Amino acid sequence: MNPAHLLILAAVCVSPLGAFSNRPMPLNLYQFKNMIQCTVPNRSWWDFADYGCYCGRGGSGTPVDDLDRCCQVHDNCYNEAEKISRCWPYFKTYSYECSQGTLTCKGDNDACAAAVCDCDRLAAICFAGAPYNNNNYNIDLKARCQ
């Protein structure tokens, strides 16, 4: 095989791998981040990524407060959405609007997208109504979330 052809073939095969490994987060989580910023504009979305027992990766034990309970409900909502055929909430994108702190899931979403959008919308609204306790950020999960 011609060396130039090998080089092109290698570039085509390697490029998609690089694109996937460099993606910062699934697109749905990017949308969820934007929903949070819509309802809670004065706080970084990152403040919710490692809060309590349920906000962030995984979840176990008793929620530490109302905000953590919002995340527990969101986790359960995603679990319900996964029951829809071929629905993967962390990767499902959807259509929505944010207008002056109000979130609306659009009507053109399929069943999975509508469910995931509503999960994210309700969580973002819940975050806006729950007090944020700095002492519950980055807690010791083993000690407090059994």
Swiss-Prot record:
Keywords: Acetylcholine receptor inhibiting toxin, Calcium, Disulfide bond, Hydrolase, Lipid degradation, Lipid metabolism, Metal-binding, Neurotoxin, Postsynaptic neurotoxin, Secreted, Signal, Toxin
Cysteine disulfide links: 38-98, 53-145, 55-71, 70-126, 77-119, 87-112, 105-117
InterPro entries tied to this protein: PLipase_A2, PLipase_A2_Asp_AS, PLipase_A2_dom, PLipase_A2_dom_sf, PLipase_A2_His_AS
Biological processes per GO annotation: arachidonate secretion; fatty acid biosynthetic process; lipid catabolic process; phospholipid metabolic process; positive regulation of fibroblast proliferation
Annotated tissue distribution: Expressed by the venom gland.
GO CC, alphabetical: extracellular region
Molecular function GO terms recorded: acetylcholine receptor inhibitor activity; calcium ion binding; calcium-dependent phospholipase A2 activity; phospholipid binding; signaling receptor binding; toxin activity
Record Pfam families: Phospholip_A2_1
Range of residues in the leader sequence: 1-21
Residues annotated to bind Ca(2+): 54, 56, 58, 75
Cofactor binding note: Binds 1 Ca(2+) ion.
Maturation-removed propeptide residues: 22-27
Catalytic machinery residues: 74, 120
EC number(s) stated in the UniProt entry for this protein: 3.1.1.4
Record Gene3D superfamilies: Phospholipase A2 domain
SMART domains documented for this protein: PA2c
Enzyme class: hydrolase
Main location: secreted
CC cofactor: Ca(2+)
Family named by the database record: Belongs to the phospholipase A2 family. Group I subfamily. D49 sub-subfamily.
Function as written in the Swiss-Prot or TrEMBL entry: PLA2 catalyzes the calcium-dependent hydrolysis of the 2-acyl groups in 3-sn-phosphoglycerides. Is able to suppress the acetylcholine (ACh)-evoked current mediated by alpha-7 (CHRNA7)-similar nAChRs in L.stagnalis neurons (IC(50)=37 nM) and to compete with alpha-bungarotoxin for binding to muscle- and alpha-7 neuronal nAChR types, as well as to AChBPs.
PANTHER family: PHOSPHOLIPASE A2, PHOSPHOLIPASE A2 FAMILY MEMBER
Protein name per Swiss-Prot or TrEMBL: Acidic phospholipase A2 CM-II
